[in-house]
């Protein structure tokens, strides 16, 4: 039965969490595994089971991860107190730098095109990309081979869906084929049309628009060990939206706005044996926002990366050697004038060796990065180019020891580094004067983690696993793009932050029943903050804030998920709960203590997917999200004081009934 297989995959994922110190979470939208141990267990059916429409639908259960934003225009990821501008985010290996406008999302993605999400919460491995202060997220899009049954050469999948809260209707079509041996191709297109939604208290939220995404991917495997593929992915969100999408209750300046991303990748893979697993990816990504007030803002990122893995066994010693190199270039633009575009060139090389001696694994690693930002210095009429240059070695070391069968202790250290990015495109379009900071330092930090993990088997189809972690990261020289008294744009270092916390995860699989519970606690202490002028009538003191750190400390997060598979009728039912405790917190930008209210949100869902018979290929997913119509706003949002200006509160959707029907043939 299909759902019996699904829970075998969930069980395998539970084993994976105890196989690596990075940790693993099986979500109600897609199974996500940590990258540190190299294991990656993915069940792509689960993304449809949760009726995922946004990134938060597939990531909110992960310990250490917070996701804010009520629509595709403003969804933002936070990981251990670091925003997505301080994470390394890739799609099919293509780096995503989308810092166009701070009131909008930097990441645009359609979950319906995603088959896997690999997450490293915290920075432990040097292999997970340059500039990862708080961790990394790697999205992988679907392939034709994922959808074709054995012996099939062509197929299609049609989908239609409805969401009641915003009167959303969605449609999707996929065509996939392997016309000749070794050649595979997929074409997918999705559309969503929707109206404004409503929060639990009846407030108008979101926008009135149409979203469109498509994926074209062609691959060819040859000579047993070689594969080459090319893909083109497009995402666009367009419609009537607030000028500041994250202030979802402010509709006085609603107008037609469009935000889109295009990513093109060319990939070569060579995998002859365990001695060599090579992957080379060249890519181009463009984020572009078309706005009647802000005009056209965007960021282009081009790059190439080569990564390899070699596994060597010698007696009692097994070595897993990961090594590679990476280059990327980012440019901002602001049309029609585009006076002073900036450019980042980043080069890095890394090596990591996991040495396994029976019950002990030691993983040393090191990355070297050369980072340069080509900016400007001078006043209007006499502006000259100025280049910031940084060189940094970032070592890492991890130890994992099996104390007794199934019980492991682990500890890790990593130095983190991130150079200054191109300035946000909105600021670039306005800047006329620049003041170079010849004493500017790159952001660095020291990341520590320790914990225990346990896995036990009850039977062939049943198991349980536990994971407990404590982490501490000390950041210094956080960078802020600041306006000086004479109106010039200047980058400054604005202190640091110590972020610590605890992450707990427990899973139980009993044949057809799967239970998971998690807890996340984090604490942020700001160091040596720099005073700045207050805005919008705020009472001082006010401080310059870096956009790579979250807006404030957040409340404790609890999650619970239960799923049961009725294999005899090919049906899965599930329940998901997320609860945030209230907390008195101080924002990064001031000393005002604000109480963030608690909230609890319950979802129920069910999937029917016949594994045989005349209805094989049919899949029906239905659920009620925010079952009890709770009034709440994400604790990750910019505005902490919900009792302040109501226009700045980004209320989350109220009760929402979703249904999606698809048929694959």
Model-predicted regions and their roles:
Residues 160, 187, 277-291, 409-412, ...:
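Membrane-embedded beta-barrel scaffold of Gram-negative outer-membrane proteins
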Residues 552-614, 625-629, 633-638:
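C-terminal beta-barrel architecture of Gram-negative outer-membrane proteins
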Residues 113-115, 121, 126-201, 207-214:
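Outer-membrane beta-barrel translocator/receptor signature
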Residues 223-225, 318-320, 341-473, 563:
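Structural signature of Gram-negative outer-membrane beta-barrels, strongest in the C-terminal barrel
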Residues 319, 356-362, 463-474, 492-588, ...:
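Gram-negative outer-membrane beta-barrel transporters
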């Amino acid at each position: 039965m299909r759902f019996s297989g699904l829970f075998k995959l969930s069980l395998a994922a539970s084993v994976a969490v105890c196989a690596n110190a990075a940790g693993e979470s099986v979500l109600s939208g897609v199974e996500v595994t940590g990258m540190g141990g190299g294991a990656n267990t993915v069940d792509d059916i689960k993304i449809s089971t949760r009726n995922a429409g946004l990134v938060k639908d597939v990531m909110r259960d992960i310990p250490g991860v917070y996701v804010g934003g009520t629509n595709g225009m403003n969804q933002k990821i936070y990981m251990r107190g670091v925003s997505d501008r301080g994470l390394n985010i890739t799609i099919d290996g293509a780096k995503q730098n989308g810092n166009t406008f701070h009131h909008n999302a930097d990441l645009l993605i359609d979950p319906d095109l995603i088959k896997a999400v690999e997450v490293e919460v915290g920075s432990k491995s040097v292999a997970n990309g340059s500039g990862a202060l708080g961790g990394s997220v790697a999205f992988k899009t679907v392939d034709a081979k994922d959808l074709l049954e054995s012996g099939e050469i062509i197929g299609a999948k049609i989908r239609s869906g409805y969401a009641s809260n915003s009167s959303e209707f969605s449609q999707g079509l996929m065509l996939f084929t392997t016309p000749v041996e070794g050649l595979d191709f997929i074409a997918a297109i999705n559309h969503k049309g929707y109206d404004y939604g409503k929060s639990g208290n009846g407030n108008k939220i979101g926008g009135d628009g149409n979203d469109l995404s498509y994926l074209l991917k062609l691959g060819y495997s040859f000579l047993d060990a070689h594969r080459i593929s090319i893909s083109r992915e497009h995402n666009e969100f367009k419609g009537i939206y607030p000028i500041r999408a994250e202030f979802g209750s402010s509709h006085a300046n609603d107008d037609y706005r469009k935000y889109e991303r295009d990513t093109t990748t060319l990939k070569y893979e060579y995998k002859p044996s365990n001695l060599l697993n090579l992957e080379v990816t060249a890519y181009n990504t463009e984020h572009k926002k078309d706005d009647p007030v802000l005009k056209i803002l965007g960021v282009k990122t081009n790059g190439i990366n080569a990564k390899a893995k070699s596994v060597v066994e010698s007696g009692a010693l097994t070595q897993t050697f990961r090594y590679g190199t990476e280059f990327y270039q980012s440019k901002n633009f602001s049309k029609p004038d585009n006076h002073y575009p900036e450019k980042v060139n980043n080069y890095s090389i890394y090596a990591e060796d996991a040495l396994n001696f029976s019950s002990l694994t030691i993983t040393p690693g090191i990355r070297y990065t050369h980072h340069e930002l080509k900016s400007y210095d001078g006043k209007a009429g006499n502006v000259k180019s100025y280049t910031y240059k940084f060189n940094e070695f970032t070592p890492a070391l991890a130890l994992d020891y099996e104390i007794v069968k199934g019980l492991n202790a682990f500890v890790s250290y990593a130095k983190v580094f991130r150079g200054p990015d191109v300035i946000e495109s909105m600021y670039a379009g306005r800047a006329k004067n620049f003041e170079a900071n010849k004493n500017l330092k790159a952001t660095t930090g020291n990341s520590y983690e320790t914990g225990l993990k346990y896995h036990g088997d009850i039977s062939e189809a049943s198991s349980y696993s536990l994971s407990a972690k404590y982490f501490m990261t000390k950041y210094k020289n956080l960078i802020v793009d600041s306006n000086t008294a004479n109106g010039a744009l200047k980058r400054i270092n604005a202190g640091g932050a110590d972020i610590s916390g605890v992450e707990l995860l427990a899973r139980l699989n009993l044949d057809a029943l799967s239970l998971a519970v998690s807890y996340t606690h984090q604490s942020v202490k700001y160091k040596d903050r720099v005073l700045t002028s207050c805005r919008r009538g705020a009472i001082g003191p006010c401080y310059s804030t870096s956009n790579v750190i979250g807006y404030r400390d957040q409340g404790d997060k609890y999650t619970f998920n239960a799923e049961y598979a009725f294999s005899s009728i090919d049906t899965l039912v599930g329940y998901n709960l997320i609860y945030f405790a209230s907390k008195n917190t101080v924002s990064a930008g001031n000393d005002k203590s604000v109480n963030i209210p608690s909230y609890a949100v319950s979802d129920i869902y069910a999937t029917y997917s016949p594994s045989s018979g005349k209805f094989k290929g049919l899949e029906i997913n239905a659920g009620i999200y925010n079952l009890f119509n709770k009034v709440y706003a994400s604790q990750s949002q910019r505005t902490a004081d919900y009792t302040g200006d109501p226009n700045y509160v980004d209320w989350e959707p109220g009760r929402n009934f979703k249904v999606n029907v698809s048929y694959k043939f």
